[in-house]
């Protein structure tokens, strides 16, 4: 179509050129008009072609799919299930696993094993709530560690929000603390003897003085 239009414009141009020599002035005017019309037609044809090409532009590729969050490991899931079982028994919502807290506890337990002879860490000034367990003579699974903390439930008196007698129950109240929503835990086997050190962190921390856990 573009070639045909160009040829037609050239024929008009030649016809005007061989017109009467006495009308050179008229010829000159017509010649300019013809060139102008041809130029306008060329612009329209080019614009039409560009519009056609633009309409066929290939759309951008779709964004790459986002990867799903990595599920907790088997040990992490065992820690989580044992905690949430105890929380559900008193009507408290479940905790979620925090890779950040898990990393913090892993670094701490490794340090306590390598530098502190597998002793308890000082958690009194930490920004998270914390529970610890040291056990020897057997392999301690995550569920066994949590169950030993939950066993302190029998010492907790909800009515007056205190532990009975001289017994301790703070590790249990931290487990069921309603405002704590994230959990991270780690375990290490001690070098001397069959012993295991377990640490769990809770965020936000629980056991706030004057408040009930739930």
Curated annotation (Swiss-Prot):
Region described as 3 X 2 AA tandem repeats of Y-I: 13-18
Gene Ontology cellular component terms for the protein in this record: extracellular space
Disulphide bridges, residue numbers: none
Annotated Sequence repeat ranges: 13-14, 15-16, 17-18
Recorded superkingdom: Eukaryota
Signal peptide: 1-19
Residue ranges of domain SCP in the record: 80-200
UniProt keyword list: Repeat, Signal
GO biological-process terms attached to the record: sexual reproduction
Keyword Transmembrane appears in the UniProt entry: no
Tissue expression remark: Highly expressed in the stigma and stylar cortex throughout pistil development. Not expressed in other organs.
Membership in a protein family: Belongs to the CRISP family.
Role: May protect the outer tissues of the pistil from pathogen attack.
The name this protein goes by in its record: STS14 protein
Organism whose genome encodes this protein: Solanum tuberosum (Potato)
The organism's taxonomic lineage, starting at the top: Eukaryota, Viridiplantae, Streptophyta, Embryophyta, Tracheophyta
């Amino acid at each position: 179509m573009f070639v045909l239009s160009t040829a037609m414009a050239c024929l008009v141009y030649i016809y005007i050129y061989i017109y009467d020599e006495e009308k050179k002035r008229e010829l000159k005017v017509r010649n300019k008009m013809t060139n102008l019309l041809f130029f306008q037609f060329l612009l329209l044809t080019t614009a039409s072609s560009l519009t056609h090409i633009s309409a066929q532009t290939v759309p951008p590729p779709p964004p790459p799919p986002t990867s799903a969050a990595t599920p907790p490991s088997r040990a992490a899931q065992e820690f989580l299930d044992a905690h949430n079982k105890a929380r559900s028994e008193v009507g408290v919502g479940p905790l979620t696993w925090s890779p950040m807290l898990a990393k913090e506890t892993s670094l701490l337990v490794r340090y306590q094993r390598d530098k502190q002879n597998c002793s308890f860490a000082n958690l009194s000034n930490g920004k998270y709530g914390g529970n610890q367990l040291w056990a020897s003579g057997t392999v301690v699974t995550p569920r066994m560690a949590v169950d030993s903390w939950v066993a302190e439930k029998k010492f907790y008196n909800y009515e007056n929000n205190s532990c009975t007698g001289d017994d301790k129950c703070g590790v249990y109240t931290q487990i069921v603390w309603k405002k704590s929503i994230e959990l991270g835990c780690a375990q290490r086997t001690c070098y001397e003897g069959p012993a295991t050190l377990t640490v769990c962190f809770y965020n936000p921390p629980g056991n706030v003085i004057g408040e009930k856990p739930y």
